[in-house]
Amino acid sequence: MSVVLLSMACSKTGLSGADGGAGTAGGGSAGTGGGSVDARPESGLKLVVEVPATVNRDLDLLFVIDNSASMASLQAKLIASFPTFMNVLRGLPGGLPNLHVAVISSDLGAGAYDSADIPGCRHHGDQGIMQNAPRGKTCSTGSLNGGQHFIVDGDGQRNYAGTLEDTFACIAALGDQGCGFEHQLGSLLRALGADGNGGPPPENYGFNRPDAVLAITILTNEDDCSAPVESTLFDPSSRYVADPLGPVSSFRCNEYGHLCGGQKPPRNADAELSGMCTSVEDGTLLRVADVAKALKALKPGALEDVLLSVIAGPPNPYNVRLTAPVLADDPSLWPSIDHSCTAADSSFADPGIRVKELADAFGGNGVFQSICGSSLEPASQRIAEEIGRRMEPTCLTGISDAQPGTPGFQPDCQVVDHFGSAFSGQSDVPLKTCRETKDVAPCWYTDAPTTDCVSGALKFLRPADRGDLRSTTFTCNP
């Protein structure tokens, strides 16, 4: 976690007055070479958080975009919402982070079978390679063409012409000719070299920086169908409803990827299964738990630096519906899954069981938003705000309001700045609230409370020269 140093123009809420009430770093003694602060152990104070002084400004954004049939209009919605996404990031204290931005498709083909067997499923698909050339529209990516496979913008460097929004629009319009057996999770693992195959594709080298926050966003209107490379799940020789694998359709992914009330979704009957379905973790498809584990392992010791967001169909309602026969030589009714949502523009999505479970596996670092709406701006804004929180101050959690009758949130905390190092000598200096210092730096305050941070995010006023400030600790009454 990191904090952002703000100007003195910010509004401050939820602080105590200068009378030694809540929020005061009182009773401490400042000094050099090992000064100490009274921890008031009798009050039951506990260390809530230690906030590093160094702000992490590196952010790697990876968009996994479904490019199968019916996705073109939804890609257009994502592109239209991208300026909103970027405005949130540009509005962060300190401005736009140092960005890497990449786009991959959901197309890994259909195992050992290619387009001669399954239309649209080229052998191995895009292999998780980050895209650097337009597909679904006429545009220019500037110097990305023939060069790097991801956008770079930060530290005074950029590798594209025009605006970042226009460049993203150029590479994010992937079209809708990709394989209908979507491999969102498999493509994601392949792109980041987390699939156990010896690293990412050469085109992707340099994207995932070790110390950067990694924010992944999956956009899809169907659930994931990622299977092991050796899988026969997509065998096109099974084409009739009565065949072992059933017809060559996306229902195969539901039948072998979901478990509803302990049973597979039925192939031969209508069924209403809302609230009953989960992913199957028997290895037919990549296990969601294994995918989450592999992604978290990319940032060992810093799980908060991986954010996994999904924009997809909600998992419910979940209904199996038999429709008219599709094959001329098979009179059987064709199994399908009803859409779980439909937008006013007739775009739709099916239940995203597996992708929702992946987002859930990241707990507070996971976001799930419905893809069905007149606009994706609300979803993009929510995701960008969650990313921003990881580039901004920490939220105090596990503590109560010391003055619940007063507007805002008044934490009862001792706050201490830690300077120096083991080599140069260390000192601990109490840090007062900005109300106590009348907004004279250095001081601290909490931002306005939100539903996601009831205490209000931690904020600081600092002089331009912070010396050798190492970190700041908050020790608070629970």
What is the meaning of each model-derived region?
Residues 15-39:
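Short, low-complexity, disordered segments immediately C-terminal to signal peptides
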Residues 11-13, 37-478:
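Divalent cation-coordinating acidic motifs and surrounding scaffolds
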Residues 6-9:
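C-terminal motif of bacterial Sec signal peptides marking the signal peptidase cleavage site
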Residues 1-3, 354:
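Sec-dependent signal peptide recognition
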